[in-house]
């Protein structure tokens, strides 16, 4: 199975979340379940049901994080400034139709978050940007439709 690229920072964020869930959230929900059980009949105990649901969500997220972390390969962004967009690069682009300028950091799929300015190298835009140089124009199909993009700046 191919490894999933991730930055060192992205892997650390996954690790911190996993530790928080295991160290803080899991024991807290176990105590809540025990407390709800102590109230007697659990068949009609809303507190018990809510705690069990929360426990299932926490355990599911822990399992998800463990799986993702096992699939990851930490990739250090290259210091090779060949002028092309690569994994870890920050790319400033302009939508040639709207004039909107946006900055994206190219990262792995497990750390991508458009709201914080990171996009996955396997997303349509991420794939289109990999290997491009400043001044190049690309046409890319996105969920919002076809966009014409000019690469303004690349920082590796």
Swiss-Prot record:
PROSITE patterns: GREAB_1 (PS00829), GREAB_2 (PS00830). InterPro entries: GreA/GreB_C_sf, TF_GreA/GreB_CS, Tscrpt_elong_fac_GreA, Tscrpt_elong_fac_GreA/B, Tscrpt_elong_fac_GreA/B_C, Tscrpt_elong_fac_GreA/B_fam, Tscrpt_elong_fac_GreA/B_N, Tscrpt_elong_fac_GreA/B_N_sf. Residues 44-67 form a coiled coil. One of its GO terms (molecular function) is RNA polymerase binding. It comes from the Bacteria. GO terms for biological process: DNA-templated transcription elongation; regulation of DNA-templated transcription elongation. The keyword Iron does not apply. Keywords: Coiled coil, DNA-binding, Transcription, Transcription regulation. The keyword DNA-binding applies. Belongs to the GreA/GreB family. PANTHER family: TRANSCRIPTION ELONGATION FACTOR GREA (PTHR30437:SF4). Necessary for efficient RNA polymerase transcription elongation past template-encoded arresting sites. The arresting sites in DNA have the property of trapping a certain fraction of elongating RNA polymerases that pass through, resulting in locked ternary complexes. Cleavage of the nascent transcript by cleavage factors such as GreA or GreB allows the resumption of elongation from the new 3'terminus. GreA releases sequences of 2 to 3 nucleotides. HAMAP family: GreA_GreB (MF_00105). This is Transcription elongation factor GreA. It comes from Syntrophobacter fumaroxidans (strain DSM 10017 / MPOB). The lineage of its organism: Bacteria, Pseudomonadati, Thermodesulfobacteriota, Syntrophobacteria, Syntrophobacterales. The gene is greA.
């Amino acid at each position: 199975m191919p490894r999933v690229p991730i930055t060192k920072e992205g892997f650390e964020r996954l690790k911190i979340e996993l530790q928080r869930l295991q160290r803080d959230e899991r024991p807290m929900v176990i105590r809540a379940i025990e407390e709800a059980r102590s109230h007697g009949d659990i068949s009609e105990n809303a507190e018990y049901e809510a705690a069990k649901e929360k426990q299932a969500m926490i355990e599911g997220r822990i399992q998800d994080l463990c799986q993702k972390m096992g699939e990851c390969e930490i990739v250090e962004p290259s210091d090779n400034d060949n002028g092309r967009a690569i994994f870890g690069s920050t790319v400033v682009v302009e939508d040639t139709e709207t004039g909107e300028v946006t900055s994206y950091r190219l990262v792995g799929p497990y750390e991508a978050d458009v709201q914080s300015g990171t996009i996955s190298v396997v997303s349509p835009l991420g794939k289109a940007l990999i290997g491009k140089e400043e001044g190049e124009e690309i046409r890319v199909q996105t969920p919002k439709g076809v966009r014409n993009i000019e690469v303004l700046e690349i920082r590796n």
